Amino acid sequence: MRSMIRTAASAAAMLVTISASGAAQSDKLAADLVKDIGDLETKVVGLAKALPEAAWAWRPMAGTRSGAEVFQHIAADNYFLPVFLGVSAPEATGVKSDYKTAQAFETRKATRDEIMAELTKSFAHLKQAVLATNPAQFPDPISMFGQTYTRQQVLILTATHLHEHLGQLIAYARSNSIKPPWSD
């Protein structure tokens, strides 16, 4: 997780530079991220609905997450990463600023319906967190996992993390002969 975060954050730093006079760019970045997260939500939730219950338990090999575990991981991190931006996770999740709380949420026993509901709530929380982050503060440094990142890097990390797991879920679906709902 930490190496993925460092890699994504480094890529984000190289790809997007916002100057002090770039407030409009910052506002656009936030709007673009919310749109992207919304598109990701549609696809992730669409795959969750398309996968039959048996496929939720499927994993490509030992030591990898099952489909259900990937969905729970996404929900957990949708709550966890905004904590570093100053947006607390809903109290009922138990997710705080330490990774152990996110892991506890991620590995809790939950039914398919509970996971589906939590996915939807977690995406709403993440989009709200992006919008709650003042674009003027995007360059501000924050500490996460013992590293220093800008708020902007953390915001971009949330989207890159979701894209990574969407790709994983597409592979899981296709390995189970399930065509992603948006795919022709």
Model-derived regions, located:
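Bacterial N-terminal signal peptides that target proteins for export
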Residues: M1-A12
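C-terminal segment of classical bacterial N-terminal signal peptides
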Residues: L15-G22
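Cleaved targeting-peptide boundary
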Residues: A23-A31
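Structural motif corresponding to alpha-helix initiation and N-cap regions
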Residues: A30, T64, K109-R112
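Short, contiguous alpha-helical
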Residues: V34-V45, A55-K100, P141-D184
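Acidic/histidine-rich alpha-helical segments that form the ligand environment
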Residues: Q103-P141, R151-H161
